[in-house]
């Protein structure tokens, strides 16, 4: 959860997928309605029409399990219509980094797939580096193998016709959602996504969230009031116990616990700090 419930009131567009917030998370929904009272658009994408749907601006029924296709279409729409928050994408994501020439994707599979083991060898999943070991970047985002162009190529297949046929959502309704949420890429706007177990309990639950993370990064909706990706948990204190380090294996900020052998801060930092040549 990147933001807190009260911060939902600062959003200009709230996309609810994989959850029934009004019934299952009424306190969180209070702040969603506060945003709606201030003019925010609230969209509910769900196979069922629920109390949440009734309180939103509009409901989008889709086939269960087709969330990734739905979001993939939004990624293509954002890129094709140049709705990205360009400064954020260039300087605060890896979009400008150049992907190694050994990496590619064909027929839905990435390079390195082992058909017998059903696993990937990720040795080619790297970026090019200069003599100092620093990732090579193209801040124009025009290099054919920069992350942004590779992303554009990958999602080019998610046409409106294809997404509509997979999800069962009409092209007109898809465009309505994509236009409303894509508008949050403007510098004075913020959009947030709220999800619950309707996303996480799928076998592709992690991929659902990662796909939405791509959208939020493209629109610059991370790290701002009214933005982020926010979990509506299925148990009373799942989020609180992790955020406030009540669990035995975490320190504040989701930092890992040290081993007994790490008797100095330097040893702890050496073990857990990401190495960088920048």
Which role does the model predict for each range below?
Residues 9, 23, 27-30, 37, ...:
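Generic recognition of stable, solvent-exposed alpha-helical segments in well-folded globular domains
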